[in-house]
Amino acid sequence: MHRSRFSRRMIGANPVAAMLALVAMVSVVALDHAGAQAWPTQPVKIVVPYGAGGLGDVQARLIADRLTKRLGQTFVIENRPGAGGTTAIESVIRAPKDGYTLLFIAGLHYTILPHMQNLKYDPFKDLEPISISGRWGMVVGVNVDSPIGSLRELIDYARANPGKVDYSSAGPGGANHLAGAALAGREKLNMGHIPFGSGPASLTAVMSKNVFVHFGNPTDIIAAAKGGKIKAIAVSTPKRMPQIPDVPTMSETIPGYDLTFWAGFVAAAGTPKNIIDRAANTLAEISREDDMVKRLYDLGIESTAIMPAEFLEIVNKERSFYEALAESAGLQRPR
C-alpha cells in the first residue's frame, strides 16, 4: 500500500523522470539476462591448479578443446600450480563474476584442504559448483614378488606386524595419502606413510621394493599392472574397474567401502545462474560424447555429468568424512 501511494506521488510529480528510471531499470535487467544467455562472447580462461602434463591438466585440456568447438569461443588453460592449489583458487575468486574465468578443481580442494590449512576463503561460500566431469578410484598395488595377493592378506599382515607395513604417496594430503590413511583408520592398522615428490616416484618405490604398498591413481598403476611391473590387489571404487575387471573392489573385503575421487568445474560465487546452467548443460553433453568417454576411460576416469545441485550435495556429504579423516591422519590445520 505505501509503495503504491509513493509511486503515484512520484509519477504525479515528475512522470517523465519516473518513466526514464523505469526504462533504465528494465534495460539493465534485460542486458544482464541477454549477456548471460549469449555467453560466451569472448575467450574463457580455465585456471588449473596443477602443472602441465599431469592428470588434472590432461583432463582439463580434453574438455576445454570440446568446449571451444561447441560454444564457438576459445577456452584457454592457465596452469597455476603452487601452495596446494590455493593460488589458483584465490585468483578465480578475485576475478570478475562474469563467467570468463572458470576453475577446474579436484574434490580434495573442496573437502580436505580447508581442514589442512588456514585458508583466506571458504570454498563452500566463495565458489559456485558447475559440473563434476570425472570420477576415479585408487588401485592398491604391491610389488610383483610380494607374498600378498589380496586386500584381506594385506590387512591381516599389517595387523599381525604393526609398523612394518608402509605406503607411499605423492605427498601429504593427496589422494594416495588419503586412501592409505582411510584404510588404516577404518581397519585400525599401524601403517607408515612415506611421501614422495610425485605419483610416479611413489609407484616406483613399490616396484623397487623400497615401500610395501601403494594406493595409486589408475592412470599410473593400471599400465604398470598390465605390464607385469606391479601386482594390483584391489580398487577403491564401489564397482570393479572395467580396465582391470579381474581386480576385486575393496568393498568385496570391507562391505560398504567406497573411496572415489572427482574433478570438475566451478566459478566464483556470484556468477549469473544462466551462465552456470549453460556451462553445466554443455559439459553434460560433452561427457556423453563417445570420444570423450573413451579418452577418459584410457586415463582410468569415468566420464560424468553431475549437475550443480547434485555437485553441492556431494561436497556437503564429503565434508564431514574428510574432516574426520584429516584428524585421524594428523593433517588438521593449526588452531
Protein language model regions, located:
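Bacterial N-terminal signal peptides
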Residues: 17-30
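Signal peptide processing junction and immediate N-terminal pro/mature segment
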Residues: 29-37
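An extracytoplasmic/periplasmic, membrane-proximal ligand-sensing/linker region
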Residues: 41-43, 185-189, 226, 273-335
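A ligand-binding cleft/hinge motif common to bilobed small-molecule-binding domains
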Residues: 108-118, 182-186, 213-246
